[in-house]
Amino acid sequence: DECANAAAQCSITLCNLYCGPLIEICELTVMQNCEPPFS
């Protein structure tokens, strides 16, 4: 789905757009799986 895709793309911006109430989970996924800086 688009929220999981946002996390896969390491994009906090896309997390905000697509994840709604799941934003915190999306952000955690990005921080755990991706190298900074996050977009």
From Swiss-Prot:
**InterPro entries on file:** Pheromone_protoz (IPR009064), Pheromone_protoz_sf (IPR036245)
Which keywords describe this protein according to UniProt? Disulfide bond, Pheromone, Secreted
Disulphides:
3-19, 10-34, 15-26
Signal sequence coordinates: none
Where would you find this protein in the cell?
Secreted
Its GO CC terms are: extracellular region
Major place of localization? secreted
Highest taxon above the source species: Eukaryota
Q: Pfam family of this protein, just one?
A: E_raikovi_mat
GO MF terms listed in the record are: pheromone activity
Its subunit composition reads:
Homodimer.
**Known function:** Mating ciliate pheromones (or gamones) are diffusible extracellular communication signals that distinguish different intraspecific classes of cells commonly referred to as 'mating types'. They prepare the latter for conjugation by changing their cell surface properties.
What name does this protein carry? Mating pheromone Er-11
Source organism of the structure: Euplotes raikovi
